Amino acid sequence: MTISDKPTPPFAEHEQAFPGKTFDMNIKPDHGEASYKGSGQLAGKKALITGGDSGIGAAVAIAYAREGADVAISYLPDEQKDAEAIAHWIDAAGRTALLIPGDISDPAHASHMIERTVDKLGGLDILVNNAAYQKYFDRFEDITLEEWQKTFDTNVHAVFNLIRLAVPVSYTHLRAHETRGN
């Protein structure tokens, strides 16, 4: 997409039920599919990106692959089609794409994500905690305790848990590379 191809305001209103899907958008976002060229800055690295199927996470996944990283992306199962589209771009960059559907707020799934990434990609160097949940309410008092909990489980607790799980395997992976002189 060139500058002249990009849509200009005013934009048509667009609403989607959670989770939003790129394939269902009226105006498709630019994740750098046609514009970003890498230069090998992440050659040989292994990355896990939560929410890597759309938005900023998708752009990061494509950029990291074009910089030379193998990329695992996590996403909600309803977003499979979006995830497959991003995997296509990772593969096209000559890198390995690993798709891990599930809910990051589930501690068992978080462990599964780290284990699969290490097992299938051979380690973990980079963790991008990109996935988030937010629901709009007109009035503060309309926010239910369940919505509040879901927001914190996804945006705070899951981030903490993934970092807690990733740090030991990342250090192990780093030490193994240092020992081999890589």
Please place each PLM-identified region on the residue numbering.
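The beta1-alpha1 cofactor-binding region of Rossmann-like NAD(H)/NADP(H)-dependent oxidoreductases
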Residues: 80, 101-114, 145
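A glycine-rich helix->loop->beta "capping" turn
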Residues: 93-96, 116-129, 135-136
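Non-catalytic terminal and boundary segments that flank Rossmann-like NAD(P)-dependent oxidoreductase
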Residues: 1-43
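Catalytic Tyr-X3-Lys loop
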Residues: 133, 141-160
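Canonical Rossmann dinucleotide-binding motif of NAD(H)/NADP(H)-dependent dehydrogenases/reductases
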Residues: 40-73
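Conserved small/polar residues in nucleotide/adenosyl-binding loops
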Residues: 172-179
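Conserved glycine-rich Rossmann-like NAD(P)H-binding loop of the short-chain dehydrogenase/reductase
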Residues: 69-85
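Amphipathic alpha-helical dimer-interface segment in Rossmann-like NAD(P)H-dependent oxidoreductases
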Residues: 115, 119, 154-171
